[in-house]
Amino acid sequence: DRERMRFMKRFKLVVAYDGTNYCGWQIQPNGITVEEVLNKTLSRFLKEEIHIIGASRTDSGVHSFGNVAVFDSETTIPPEKLCFALNPQLPEDIRIVSSEQVPGDFHPRYCDTRKTYEYHIQNGKIPLPTERLYSHLVIFPLNIQAMQEASQYLVGTHDFKSFCAAKTQAQTTVRTVTGIEVEAHPLSEGEYPSKKVIIRVTGEGFLYNMVRIISGTLIKVGLGVLSLIHI
């Protein structure tokens, strides 16, 4: 094993995926995950046992434009060519955007200083087929300005205990949110127009379901169900 370690190199992958058909990133006893698919594909392709480590353990149904992951391997394939070699082996809803060699002590969870999550909403009376898998439908009009104002109360270092799922196992519920943006773009016109509302949350790390609960809270503010003083 010591002899084998001499030839080991660490590779960094940037992974994009559509999370619709996956039970999140992290391997689960019941249900297929992105991590499991990558481990099996890499192990089969490189003919050695691979265990990948991801920066963000995204929840079930969450998509990613660029989750950073690393693995160790003896492969002699040029690092920048790995993405092109691996992508044909992967299902169409997972793609390696880039690949490179990194120092052996590089760890995506500790080197990663910032994460950004987006929560997409279709705001309109008629559900659009193109949005059904990727947006939460809200049929009543949202007050975007109120949502923007409310979001700023959550920026900074706070105890987010009331903004995480009950099964959170984190040692502390204090987290730092560095920015929240709420923006709206037109989706469709006519008698029943629709707009896309995007809630973009950036921070150093998040609790289980924290971004979903923040988004749900801001939706309640936008609907007038919750006032700013309750944030």
Go through each PLM region and give its residues.
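Structured-RNA-binding interfaces characteristic of tRNA pseudouridine synthases
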Residues: 4-230
